[in-house]
Amino acid sequence: MPSVVINGPKIDDIEIKRKLVKDITDALEKAYKLQREAYTVVIKENSPENVGSGGILIVDKYKKA
């Protein structure tokens, strides 16, 4: 069944995560017309020292000089 994986920085507020999962599920339900239980949403939180962009670690890219 349809699934969505979100890769991004850590979200500390559980209420924001709940809303994010609900909103994405709402959009999937509208698009696919399946029961809500058919969808899976996974939030993968990545620390800045584990992600690179343009060949540079995020932790280095936004490091204060």
Regions found by a protein language model. Name each.
Residues M1-A65:
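A domain-level signal for the structural core that forms small-molecule/cofactor-binding pockets
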